[in-house]
């Protein structure tokens, strides 16, 4: 299996048990995301990866939670998405485009 490229990493603040999945913006340098799933047995983590995959049109296999599996603050790596592409997509979503 070929080695993956060096990933782009982003710091997130996750708010589980929300009414719906929603990207809410930046807070203290962290991208804040509401996730509807409960924070038990990895449900919120799986829902986060699913949501990011859908939101950013990136395969789930190319998204990895590197730190914060049991906390709200997480570091997520994207193996097939550049920082520029990530920022452009997030900006467009936050602007409502």
Curated annotation (Swiss-Prot):
One of its GO terms (cellular component) is cytoplasm. Pfam families: DUF167 (PF02594). SUPFAM superfamilies: YggU-like. HAMAP family: UPF0235. PANTHER family: UPF0235 PROTEIN C15ORF40. Belongs to the UPF0235 family. This is UPF0235 protein DET1292.
